[in-house]
Structure formats: structure tokens, C-alpha cells
Amino acid sequence: MKVKVAINGFGRIGRMVFRKAMLDDQIQVVAINASYSAETLAHLIKYDTIHGRYDKEVVAGEDSLIVNGKKVLLLNSRDPKQLPWREYDIDIVVEATGKFNAKDKAMGHIEAGAKKVILTAPGKNEDVTIVMGVNEDQFDAERHVIISNASCTTNCLAPVVKVLDEEFGIESGLMTTVHAYTNDQKNIDNPHKDLRRARACGESIIPTTTGAAKALSLVLPHLKGKLHGLALRVPVPNVSLVDLVVDLKTDVTAEEVNEAFKRAAKTSMYGVLDYSDEPLVSTDYNTNPHSAVIDGLTTMVMEDRKVKVLAWYDNEWGYSCRVVDLIRHVAARMKHPSAV
């Protein structure tokens, strides 16, 4: 039995979720709602500057894409309430436009007949925020309809924080995400409500805000108010880095910290968190499927309890892999996902 999925919005994350979902024999991507022609969408799926050429045949049909012989319906509506989710018996909509992250707006998909909505961003008044590997056990299929997959940075930060807190206890901390530029910035200097993001993204290191530390309290509520942070947008197109400094409740060594991450990577956080002691750089983590990869060579301890940890993440592919994991997690707990 496959879960029937529709993707609303086909930008960077929408397309990566599509690529990953098409590899999963438990998921049927029924439809894509996007504003561009079939020819344009087919081309953008087949050829990707960051993640390379798609290894499946993609053909533009009439109001559809044909991927390795499988038809995916193409729609073009700016109003979720007008989408034919009831007609196609859609179980889960992946909301990837960035425009419908508030619950009242995302509910348009439910009014149209979908059973659940997964937001590929932090939500507003969402029913629950889930970070796989951290709090997926909090999902309640009876109560939760609008589900946020949080942000790519929160997906990196939360597993790292959880390991440190469970192993050693966290008093407080500060994080910086050294983040690849995104579509929310300008290629050349142009107006933006954030005057730093108004500057050319390929030319400067750009300090700006991140909600990752604040959002952490949604998945690890006992740490509310204990972590804060900011972002540095840097001139690379993909792969980012969380730089976390925490004060722990117990004395540790760098070796003990790294061993804790190694254990988690092999057990409770297998597939979500990984560990590396190789001298790698950001491009080496392109298309890495993990939410966070600990850079063991850079772990530092000062005065026994102040710890610095670096964690790499592919902010596009790694995050999209967690969206697909969340689809499977939600579908497995729904009473009657559609039979295919």
C-alpha cells in the first residue's frame, strides 16, 4: 500500500523532495502544483546545477510529467482550496511554496480533500513541529493535521543538541549557522526588508537572523530560552554548517563528546546524524542525506564544560530526505492511507 502525495510548490525543496520520493516504493507522487510549463519543470528536474543530472527519464506531457513511464499530474492553481485533492484521494500534501505556512492558509489543502499537510518550513500555529530523530514520537495522527518539518538548520541543530543534552546536560548555548545563500537573498543589490539580505549574495558574508535556536524549543521544550543564535550567509550555493558552543552540566573531554556522537550515529540517530574525522570541506557534503554530520576534528573543550561542535548539513538534499522520512512516518500512523 502506497501513500498518495501531492507537492505544492516546485522550487529547490519541492524538486529535491520529488527526486527523493520517486526513489521510495512506499510513496506515489500523484500531482505537482506549480506555476510553470511541463517543459520547464521537466528540464529543471533533469538538470540541476548543485545535485547533478537526474538519473531517470523525464518527459513533458500534456499537463503532466512522465518519469520512467509513470505519469505525474501537473496543476496550476494559486489557491489551495481549488486543488483537486479529494478527486485524487490525496493523503499528504507537501507544502513547499513558502506561502501557506500559517495553519489557516495550509488548511486550504484540507478543505480541498487532503488528509494531512507537511510544511517544508517553520509554521505558524501549526499542530506540531517534528524533527526526525528528535521528537517524531510526538506525532499524533488523531490530533495533528498541519505538521511542520521545521527548517534545515533546526534539523541539523536539534539532533546535535539532543545528544549533548542527554549525555552531559546543557546549561546554555549559542549557535551560528554558516549558511549557503538561498532564494530569499538578492543576486545583485536590490531592495529587501532585511537590508543585509538586500546585498549581492555572491559577494559578501551576510549576517542575518535565524529562527533555528528559537524553534528548537518546539521539539525540545525543556531547553526553551537556553539557546540563541544568528546566521552568516556566505557565498556558496549549497551545504551549510552549524557552529554550536554550549556550557554543559558535567565535565567532559573532546574525546568523550566525540564518542557520544559516534554512538548516536550508529544507534538512536542512525541515518539522521553522522560523524566524520576526515579533513573535509563543504563541497564534500553535497548531496549528503544526513541532517547533521559532526566534524570530529574540530570539537573543542575549554575549562572542562564549555564545548564547541561543528556540524555540516546539505541544506537542500539532507532536509528533503527528512521530509520524505516524515511522509513515511505520518503515513504509517494514519488509519486509512489510500491504497494504490
Curated annotation (Swiss-Prot):
Keywords: Cytoplasm, Gluconeogenesis, NAD, NADP, Nucleotide-binding, Oxidoreductase. Its EC number is 1.2.1.59. SUPFAM superfamilies: Glyceraldehyde-3-phosphate dehydrogenase-like, C-terminal domain (SSF55347), NAD(P)-binding Rossmann-fold domains (SSF51735). It comes from the Bacteria. D-glyceraldehyde 3-phosphate binds at residues 151-153, 182, 197, 210-211, 233. The keyword Transferase does not apply. GO terms for biological process: gluconeogenesis; glucose metabolic process. Coiled coil: none annotated. Belongs to the glyceraldehyde-3-phosphate dehydrogenase family. Homotetramer. Interacts with BrxC. This is Glyceraldehyde-3-phosphate dehydrogenase 2. It comes from Bacillus subtilis (strain 168).
